[in-house]
Design a protein with these regions (language model features):
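Signature of the first transmembrane helix
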Residues: 2-6, 20-78, 233-256, 448
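Helix-loop junctions and terminal segments of transmembrane helices
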Residues: 74-90, 270-273, 278-299, 370-371
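Membrane-interface junctions at transmembrane-helix termini in multi-pass inner-membrane proteins
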Residues: 145-167, 350-381
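Interfacial segments at transmembrane-helix termini and the short loops linking adjacent helices
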Residues: 53, 121-139, 261-264, 327-357
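Interhelical loop/hinge segments that connect adjacent transmembrane helices in multipass membrane
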Residues: 2-22, 163-166, 187, 191-197, ...
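Hydrophobic alpha-helical transmembrane segments
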Residues: 133-137, 166-215, 384-388, 400-426
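Membrane-water interface segments that mark the loop-to-transmembrane alpha-helix transition
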Residues: 24-36, 62, 74-122, 300-323
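Transmembrane helical elements of multi-pass membrane transporters/channels
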Residues: 25-41, 172, 176, 197-209, ...
Length: 449
């Protein structure tokens, strides 16, 4: 019996070995991430079948701007908060001062962001939402909800409360699915209602997990403002630029062809479909980052290089597994799943799928640079990728082809730059020379949908 048990244990699949090595509750985080990712598809499918093309285009643009600007601004707050809280927990210090000052920083960011939107409400409404100022207000509310979720998840992850973290993701996803399907079955035709789902669901999820968060927050020594802000600026800039690269296609199309609502909506559907591999990769990213950080901290050059290479292989397989079916079936699938018009071809999906593969590779290499404390080199890679995207978008030609190809070339440029940066950094000094590299491993998981 014991021999058989040992044999069975030794023959576990690689995925089972990875899951067993994760901290308690992390599997719930993965489950919550999966549910939240599925919610994006359900939300957009319900909107696609319920709304007119112009109204669906407005929802598509709001979703894209939220995923670009919102994630770019507030996900870095979650990352830095997780890192600092986790360090305090290890040192036996309370995290209440960290939470208070992070709330001040986040509130300041929200005031600047929403204040700017209030000043420019009319131009924003005319440019993106067919003149509807209520959609601008819905976008501002969604920014507030996203910020609340990122701050609370940052603290929960740093405290090791992965069960509550996963619960927040799961509640958010379940509510988005339930409300969106309810709106579709109830024949709701208002884009505002579908937009407000992005505010209501995450706020309820935050309230559900507020009690375990507050019960774990203890008083402690004050934290310096510089400790919270020193790494935040380059991280925010890098994340914003990376979100520009991955989400620019929809906004670029709206700016280049404001009267083509069908193309705007169809491109969002294509982006969501082509990003399925990115969504899968995001649910496993934290464990991969932890491995890179531990090998770097131990000075294990061979282990660091081997793990980074294997991660790139896994990402490539994911990209091909999702990209080939998307290229072949994508034009048909977006019509069936999202009720999109016949506005995109297989070549467009080929570029989108290739862009997703390159984008995932850039994410892996960018995280390696963070582990090696090369934040500015990561920022440089995304900056050059954004330049390549803009240049390609402005080249004459069919709009759909330009914006899809721009995604590919922008991501490819970032990959090449970051590969060179990792290579040069790794040759100059071993990972062990990077003191505190293990702090770059963050227990919170990333939403790519």
């Amino acid at each position: 019996m014991n021999d058989e048990g040992s044999t069975a244990t030794g023959r576990r699949s690689p995925l089972a070995k990875v899951l067993s090595a994760l901290p308690p509750g992390t599997q719930l985080v993965i489950g919550g991430t999966v549910l939240l990712g599925a919610a994006s598809y359900a939300h957009l499918m319900a909107a696609g079948y319920s709304l007119s093309k112009p109204n669906m285009a407005s929802v598509s643009l709001l979703w894209t701007i939220l995923m670009s600007v919102g994630l770019g601004l507030f996900f870095p707050v979650e990352q830095e908060l997780t890192r600092i809280v986790a360090a305090r927990v290890v040192g036996g210090q309370g995290v209440a001062p960290v939470l208070r000052r992070t709330l001040v920083i986040t509130a300041t960011m929200l005031v600047v962001l929403t204040g700017g939107m209030a000043v420019a409400v009319r131009p924003l409404a005319d440019t993106f939402f067919d003149g509807r100022t209520d959609m601008v207000l819905a976008l501002a509310a969604a920014f507030v909800a996203m910020a609340a979720g990122n701050v609370t998840r940052g603290v929960l992850a740093g405290l090791g409360r992965f069960g509550a973290y996963g619960t927040q993701l799961a509640v958010d996803g379940a509510l988005r699915i339930a409300i969106a399907l309810g709106c579709a079955l109830g024949h709701v035709r208002s884009p505002l209602v579908f937009a407000l789902i992005l505010t209501a669901a995450p706020l309820v999820a935050v309230l559900v997990t507020l009690r375990p968060l507050l019960s774990s927050v203890r008083p402690g020594p004050q934290v310096a403002w510089s400790a919270l802000t020193s790494g935040l600026a380059p991280l925010v800039a890098s994340t914003l630029l990376s979100q520009v690269v991955v989400n620019a296609a929809v906004v670029s199309t709206q700016l280049l062809a404001p009267d083509n609502a069908a193309l705007v909506a169809g491109l969002l559907n294509a982006v969501v479909l082509a990003r399925v591999p990115l969504f899968v990769f995001g649910s496993l990213q934290a464990s991969l980052l932890a491995g890179l950080s531990s090998t770097a901290a131990a000075g294990d050059r061979a282990g660091f290089s081997k793990l980074l290479g294997r991660t790139c292989v896994v990402v490539t397989v994911l990209g091909l597994a999702g990209g080939i079916p998307a290229t072949i079936l994508g034009p048909w699938l977006i019509q069936v799943l999202f009720k999109a018009d016949d506005v995109l071809g297989s070549l467009d999906f080929l570029w989108m799928s290739a862009g997703t593969l390159c984008y995932m590779l850039a994410m892996v290499l960018g995280q390696a640079l963070l582990v090696l404390h090369r934040h500015r080199l990561q920022l440089l890679g995304w900056a050059l990728g954004t330049v390549a995207l803009i240049v390609t978008t402005l080249v004459p030609g069919p709009i759909a082809t330009r914006v899809c190809l721009a995604y590919t070339l922008g991501s490819l440029t970032a990959v090449v730059c970051m590969f060179a940066a990792v290579r040069l950094t790794f040759l100059r000094e071993p990972p062990a020379a990077q003191s505190g590299a293990d702090q770059s491993a963050r227990p919170s998981l990333v939403d790519t949908v």
